[in-house]
């Protein structure tokens, strides 16, 4: 809105307003606006959630150190989502379709998380939607995003090719080209692409959700991952940088830098209240939304295969759960003392603050590695 008003309408009358045409300027202000909103609304939301008794339920079989957290206000993801959406609407070019796709992902996955959190509160147990219900809703939301991208591909504004790290020329198409001319088979031709998009976005959403088990852990890793994705987005949308690094130049996705900056700013603001000992938890309304948004941005900028490195801790946490469940079903033995992995280290006697800090360090190293791969091609 501010971009439309201050640049598109008024910059011809006042030259300094041309600053609003620069992505870096608007990204910085989007991040600062998100930070200000999160910091300003945080205390109010904490008070309101306490008044409505929207408190976290703690499992009896969980680590004993967590029992003191019972009743801590949850659903703080509402604050994060608002702090992302408002700056994006203010500072982004709203004629850009990729901005709306990213916000659709944030809102739809946030809505799924809200329903899940609300169900947990009503039942006064740590059980919301069933795994099948949640997966179905997430797949539907991601599927809609994939179909929208198929439409953009038809208009020549998006590619269904898969960019493979370390390889410049190898970019397989995730669509059956031979079926595309047949209009009745158009969606079937893009079925591999649609399924891949669903896998990336749903997987990212659930991975962040699994990581959200310690004060500040998930949101700290989100800041790192979102920062790396924001850098990748800016590079993809910048003709000179894209040419230098020999990656696909996608002019319109550059606007997503503002969305990424808003995620970073909102997450930093939320971390102020979520740092150990946490005053508020994000809940599924936050973790599912953030994970879905990160996965969607990765899909939009064609860096899906870099996402496991960008969000390294999220992947490690998710894999630890899969290994634990698979091992128990096949061998009736557990690999870890408890999954996700951060609980395993708690049972080993590590302090919560030490686990969080070390996981942040690993997340930072993974994100840096992801950025270095741009030149290793």
Where are these predicted regions, by residue range?
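Membrane interface segments of multi-pass transport proteins and intramembrane proteases
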Residues: 120-129, 166-172
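Membrane-interface helix-loop junction between the first two transmembrane segments
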Residues: 43-61
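Alpha-helical transmembrane segments
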Residues: 2-45, 80-111, 145-169, 190-377
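Juxtamembrane helix-capping/reentrant segments at transmembrane boundaries
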Residues: 58-72, 126-138, 342, 347
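Short juxtamembrane and helix-loop transition motifs at transmembrane-helix boundaries
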Residues: 61-69, 124, 178-186, 243-251, ...
């Amino acid at each position: 809105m501010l971009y439309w008003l201050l640049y598109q309408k008024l910059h011809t009358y006042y030259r300094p307003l041309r600053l609003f045409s620069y992505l870096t300027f608007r990204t910085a202000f989007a991040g600062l606006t998100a930070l200000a909103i999160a910091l300003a609304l945080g205390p109010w939301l904490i008070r309101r959630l306490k008044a409505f008794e929207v408190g976290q339920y703690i499992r009896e079989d969980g680590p004993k150190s967590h029992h003191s957290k019972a009743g801590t206000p949850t659903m703080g993801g509402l604050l994060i989502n608002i702090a992302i959406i408002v700056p994006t609407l203010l500072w982004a070019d709203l004629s850009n379709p990729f901005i709306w796709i990213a916000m659709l992902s944030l809102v739809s996955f946030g809505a799924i998380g809200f329903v899940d959190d609300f169900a947990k509160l009503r039942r006064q147990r740590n059980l919301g939607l069933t795994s099948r219900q949640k997966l179905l809703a997430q797949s539907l939301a991601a599927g809609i995003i994939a179909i929208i991208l198929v439409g953009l591909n038809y208009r020549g504004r998006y590619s269904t090719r898969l960019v493979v790290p370390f390889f410049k020329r190898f970019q397989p198409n995730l669509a059956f080209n031979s079926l595309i001319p047949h209009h009745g088979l158009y969606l079937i031709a893009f079925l591999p692409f649609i399924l891949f998009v669903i896998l990336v976005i749903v997987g990212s959403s659930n991975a962040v959700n699994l990581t959200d088990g310690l004060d500040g852990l998930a949101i700290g890793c989100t800041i790192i991952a979102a920062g790396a994705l924001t850098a990748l987005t800016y590079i993809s949308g910048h003709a000179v940088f894209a040419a230098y690094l020999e990656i696909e130049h996608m002019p319109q996705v550059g606007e997503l830098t503002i969305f990424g900056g808003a995620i970073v700013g909102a997450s930093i603001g939320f971390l102020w209240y979520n740092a150990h000992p946490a005053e508020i938890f994000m809940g599924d309304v936050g973790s599912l939304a953030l994970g879905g948004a990160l996965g969607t941005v990765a899909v939009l900028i064609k860096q899906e295969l870099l996402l496991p490195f960008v969000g390294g801790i999220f992947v490690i946490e998710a894999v630890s759960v899969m290994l634990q469940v698979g091992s128990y079903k096949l061998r009736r033995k557990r690999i870890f003392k408890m999954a996700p992995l951060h609980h395993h280290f708690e049972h080993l006697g590590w302090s919560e603050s030490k686990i969080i800090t070390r996981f942040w360090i690993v997340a930072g190293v993974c994100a840096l590695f992801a950025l270095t791969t741009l030149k290793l091609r």
